């Protein structure tokens, strides 16, 4: 097949990917006789989502690992799938309905869910189509969705089991509440940013009048409207100012209630007045204080964020008490107008002592931008710290498997984050007040009793069994009464109760829980639910589970170590007894070139598909300004975008983008994405393409030394006469193969990319191809044959080595190169064996010779530069040194240093006017006529310029302000410049001195 003149990625990508997929190259290996297994789980992206740079980055890493292990011959599974993304998906569909003037409540639950499933079918394939564009190779035949029948069954089975073990319970606790969505939300869905607010200083008068000079306690708060739910004022137990007041009460303004003054270590004595209001139903810290002090909880906001006429009141353990009437002027108001009303009334009473401007962290819903309210509601929870039947909590087990090294983090420092979160864990709220998601498998009877079961039939069965037991007990009591001679008129309540129970039994209905499970619950089961887990495993064999649980590595961002990683460890270990994965590779978050987070509101989002295909500036502006939460930002975003990308974004192709992602995968929290890197790696792909064209032009139709031959014939004059340059590139290849393998094992994909890049660009293309040209032009037939063989064999190996990072170009080139290189063992590079270093082929002598040759060539090039001689002008070289070595190097020197001839002499006279370069034991001089006056003038000017540069650099580096304040890299750059200027001066001054007397 003839290779195109230039690399055209779009055409290659469109052709190659369908070939790979249709031929089953991505299918999971299920060879149980092969003990080597590699499995990686795709963190399931939202089904309604689109590919963003973070997806592109971690999927490149996952695919590189998958291709690497597949080529090593391991059983390999990359498990793909998508997440139903409860809140995100429901919001999308509700917005669509809203545009039609319809609400989900107008449709009803069943009809609304039909609409969501329609949307899922329509939109769900977007992200997997985009993954294909990235060249990813998961086993698409095993693609899963978190609400598939099998996964949903696993969700139900685990919920029932945990409930029966006492590890799932229903309770009234404080949660993050989004009043607009009307549901509890996770911490990950809450964004806290600093905003301008106010700090209100309110006087709480003592119930029994002033105490000394004090009328009461002054409390500072940013939420005066929650004053209505206060149940105490707390001070620090060691605060001498208030020690004598502990145990007294204050009159709570506007309410007519009196609340105690309590002592608690939570109080910061240095902040404000040192007095803090306690509102357990509306603040997470206050909730904890309330639990410690057995304080009631008064809920002064309804779920929509408005103040009720009568606030619900609960004991510490969530039992209802008599409600608390709210002030008439405040009841019915939303929380913000309620705040204004409370402030006005406090001012009228003279109790508002001061209002100050104040910066505060305001929690807002990441999807609604509405202020999140800590809300006391009935929710379902997983008990994170409660010991199970084995005496250990699920959190303790999750900590143990990391502490023991059974699960390892890369980089290791993320263990601290994992431990910190788990050591400060709270029970996990797993219920959401949504319609889209896994409906909680719990049913209620008319008296509020809960029945958790796999299905309604099982719940009814349990309920009827309870009813039958109660009926039997009551009937036994009736019989006992009758045996004592009592008649029905004497136990009417008992008869009435029996009548009610019989009626209910005949009716036989239960009400299912309306809430659905938190999306993270089903995500926590992902490591085993996707492998078709059943409770019978491992007693009942399952090849996928047997081979791939635990999986090898999880690739994830640091932001979800707690929300996803830790929960997978807990749930998988508790349910299956196995860890979910052996390694956790934690990467940073992709940011723009300036280190800013990519976000719609900042207008700096990049779509990886746009980097692959390119996009015009007008279309890019339209994408960035469409659908903004704040349309006023459109103008500034457009201006910034047009300045940054005046011509739009060029097409880089998938391979260049993947190589860029891999090169950026260094340890750290932030990854700055610079488009210039993409351009550099596109150039790399072009260089690899052109190098292959060169090799093919010199090898196709030629004797490339691929015929069978005896090992002893690879000697001078034999069938293959390998030069020191041939042995050098093979030796360097072994070192590169070893480095790549080591860095893949260490999850240092940046170093994998660097090793491949430096070998291909710096050693194979820049040096070996040039050396090979000389050998093909000047060598014997045996040397030419050996050179062609080396060109092909090294190139073919390089293509396999680079394939996990840049799959498309390597497949395209390998198809042509492999047959010429004598490889006929695979139909695709994907199925070819990954290169493994043969350390016995490292040739240090040849490496030393090439290093010496390079030094000579650099010296010749430097001489040209010093004398301002055009690179195109061929000149003779005079060389003094080891005549045998120089004779061997002469053809290469002539070819690579653009010399007309190389004259080897015993020594170069001291009276020669031309500059002489020294490289090791060799002295080199270009034979050129010197215009003494002109050269003297040139050297004088150049020395003066360099002395000026030295003075400037020394002045900068002598300035303490520059050295202390400039970035370290800038200071080092200045030091390097100074060293370079001085080194050049050391070369030029002797040359000028030589000319001085002429």
Curated annotation (Swiss-Prot):
Pfam family, one: Anticodon_1
Entry's EC annotation: 6.1.1.9
Record's keyword annotation contains Zinc: no
Ranges spanned by the short sequence motif 'KMSKS' region, renumbered to the chain: 597-601
Superkingdom, taxonomy of origin: Bacteria
GO cellular component terms, A-Z: cytosol
Binding site for ATP: 600
Places the protein is found: Cytoplasm
GO biological process terms held by the UniProt record: valyl-tRNA aminoacylation
PROSITE patterns (UniProt xref): AA_TRNA_LIGASE_I
Protein name: Valine--tRNA ligase
Coiled-coil blocks: 455-486, 929-989
GO molecular function, one term: valine-tRNA ligase activity
Entry comment, domain topic: ValRS has two distinct active sites: one for aminoacylation and one for editing. The misactivated threonine is translocated from the active site to the editing site.
Keywords: Aminoacyl-tRNA synthetase, ATP-binding, Coiled coil, Cytoplasm, Ligase, Nucleotide-binding, Protein biosynthesis
Disulfide bridge map: none
Reactions this protein catalyses: tRNA(Val) + L-valine + ATP = L-valyl-tRNA(Val) + AMP + diphosphate
Major location category of this protein: cytoplasm
SUPFAM superfamilies linked: Anticodon-binding domain of a subclass of class I aminoacyl-tRNA synthetases, Nucleotidylyl transferase, tRNA-binding arm, ValRS/IleRS/LeuRS editing domain
Family named by the database record: Belongs to the class-I aminoacyl-tRNA synthetase family. ValS type 1 subfamily.
Motif 'HIGH' region: where in chain: 45-55
Assembly description: Monomer.
Purpose of the protein: Catalyzes the attachment of valine to tRNA(Val). As ValRS can inadvertently accommodate and process structurally similar amino acids such as threonine, to avoid such errors, it has a 'posttransfer' editing activity that hydrolyzes mischarged Thr-tRNA(Val) in a tRNA-dependent manner.
């Amino acid at each position: 097949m003839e290779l195109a003149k230039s690399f055209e990625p779009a055409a290659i990508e469109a052709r190659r990917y369908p070939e790979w997929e249709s031929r089953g190259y991505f299918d999971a290996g299920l060879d149980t006789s092969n003990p080597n297994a590699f499995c990686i789980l795709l963190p399931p992206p939202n089904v309604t989502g689109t590919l963003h740079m973070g997806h592109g980055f971690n999927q490149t890493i996952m695919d590189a690992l998958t291709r690497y292990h597949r080529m090593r011959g391991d059983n390999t599974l990359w498990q793909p799938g998508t997440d139903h993304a409860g809140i995100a998906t429901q919001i999308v569909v509700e917005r669509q309905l809203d545009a039609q003037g319809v609400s989900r409540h107008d449709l009803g639950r069943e009809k609304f869910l039909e609409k969501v499933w329609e949307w899922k079918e329509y939109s769900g394939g977007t992200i997997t189509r985009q993954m294909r564009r990235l060249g990813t190779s998961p086993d698409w035949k095993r693609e899963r969705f978190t609400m598939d029948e099998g996964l949903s069954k696993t969700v139900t089975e685990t919920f029932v089991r945990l409930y029966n073990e006492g590890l799932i319970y229903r309770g009234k606790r404080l949660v993050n509440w989004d009043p607009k969505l009307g549901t509890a939300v996770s911490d990950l869905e809450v964004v806290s940013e600093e905003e301008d607010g106010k700090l209100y200083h309110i006087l709480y008068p003592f119930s029994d009048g002033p105490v000394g000079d004090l009328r009461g306690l002054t409390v500072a708060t940013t939420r005066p409207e929650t004053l209505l739910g206060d149940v105490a004022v707390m001070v620090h137990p060691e605060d001498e100012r208030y020690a004598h007041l502990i145990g007294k009460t204050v009159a709570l303004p506007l309410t007519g209630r009196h609340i105690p003054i309590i002592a608690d270590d939570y109080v910061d004595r240095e902040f404000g007045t040192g007095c803090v209001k306690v509102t357990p139903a509306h603040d997470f810290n206050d909730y904890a204080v309330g639990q410690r002090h057995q304080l009631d909880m008064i809920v002064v906001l309804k779920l929509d964020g408005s103040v009720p006429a009568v606030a619900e009141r609960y004991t510490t353990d969530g039992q209802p008490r008599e409600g608390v009437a709210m002030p008439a002027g405040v009841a019915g108001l939303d929380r913000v107008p309620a705040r204004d009303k409370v402030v006005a009334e406090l001012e009228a009473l003279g109790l508002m002592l001061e209002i100050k401007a104040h910066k505060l962290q305001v929690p807002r819903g990441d999807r609604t931008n509405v202020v999140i309210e800590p809300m006391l509601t009935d929710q379902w929870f997983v008990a994170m710290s409660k010991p199970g039947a084995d005496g250990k909590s699920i959190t303790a087990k999750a900590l143990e498997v990391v502490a023991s090294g059974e699960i390892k983090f890369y980089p290791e420092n993320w263990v601290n984050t994992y431990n910190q979160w788990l050591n400060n864990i709270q029970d996990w709220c797993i219920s959401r007040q949504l319609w889209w998601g896994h409906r909680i498998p719990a049913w209620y009877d008319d008296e509020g009793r809960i029945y958790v079961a796999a299905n309604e039939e099982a719940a009814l069965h349990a309920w009827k069994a309870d009813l039958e037991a109660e009926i039997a007990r009551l009937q036994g009591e009736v019989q006992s009464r009758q045996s004592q001679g009592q008649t029905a008129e004497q136990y009417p309540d008992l008869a009435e109760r029996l009548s009610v129970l019989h009626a209910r039994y005949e009716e036989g209905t239960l009400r299912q829980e309306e809430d659905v499970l938190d999306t993270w619950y089903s995500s926590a089961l992902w490591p085993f639910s996707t492998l078709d887990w059943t409770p019978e495993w491992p007693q009942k064999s399952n090849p996928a589970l047997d081979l791939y649980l635990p999986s090898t590595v999880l690739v994830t961002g640091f932001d979800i170590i707690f929300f996803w990683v830790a929960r997978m460890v807990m749930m998988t270990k508790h349910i299956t007894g196995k860890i979910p994965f052996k390694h956790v590779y934690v990467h940073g978050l992709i940011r723009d070139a300036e280190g800013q987070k990519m976000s719609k509101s900042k207008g700096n989002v990049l779509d990886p598909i746009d980097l692959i295909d390119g996009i015009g500036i007008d279309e890019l502006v339209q994408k960035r300004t469409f659908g903004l939460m704040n349309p006023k930002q459109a103008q500034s975003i457009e201006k910034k975008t047009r300045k940054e990308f005046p011509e739009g974004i060029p097409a880089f192709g998938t391979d260049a983008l993947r190589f860029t992602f891999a090169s950026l995968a260094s340890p750290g929290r932030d990854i700055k994405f610079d488009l210039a890197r993409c351009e550099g790696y596109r150039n790399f792909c072009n260089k690899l393409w052109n190098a292959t064209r060169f090799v093919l032009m010199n090898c196709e139709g030629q004797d490339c030394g691929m015929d069978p031959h005896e090992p002893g014939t690879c000697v001078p004059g034999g069938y293959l006469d390998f030069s020191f340059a041939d042995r050098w590139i093979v030796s360097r290849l072994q070192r590169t193969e070893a480095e790549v393998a080591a860095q893949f094992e260490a999850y240092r994909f940046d170093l994998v990319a660097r090793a491949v890049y430096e070998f291909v660009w710096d050693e194979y293309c820049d040096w070996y191809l040039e050396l090979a040209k000389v050998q093909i032009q000047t060598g014997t037939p045996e040397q030419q044959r050996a050179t062609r063989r080396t060109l092909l064999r090294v190139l073919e190996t390089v293509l396999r080595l680079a394939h996990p990072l840049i799959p498309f170009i390597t497949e395209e080139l390998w198809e042509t190169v492999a047959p010429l290189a004598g490889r006929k063992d695979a139909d695709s590079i994907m199925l070819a064996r990954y290169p493994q270093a043969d350390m016995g082929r490292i040739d240090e002598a040849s490496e030393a010779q090439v290093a010496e040759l390079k030094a000579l060539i650099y010296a010749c090039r430097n001489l040209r530069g010093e004398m301002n001689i055009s690179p195109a002008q061929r000149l003779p070289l005079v060389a003094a040194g080891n005549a045998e070595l120089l004779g061997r190097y002469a053809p290469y020197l002539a070819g690579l240093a653009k010399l007309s001839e190389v004259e080897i002499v015993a020594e170069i006279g001291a009276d020669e006017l031309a500059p002489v370069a020294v490289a090791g034991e060799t002295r080199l001089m270009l034979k050129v006529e010197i215009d003494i006056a002109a050269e003297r003038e040139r050297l004088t000017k150049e020395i003066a310029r360099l002395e000026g540069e030295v003075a400037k650099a020394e002045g900068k580096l002598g300035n303490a302000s520059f050295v202390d304040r400039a970035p370290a890299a800038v200071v080092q750059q200045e030091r390097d410049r100074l060293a370079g200027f001085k080194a050049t001066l050391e070369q030029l001054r002797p040359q000028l001195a030589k000319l001085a007397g002429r």
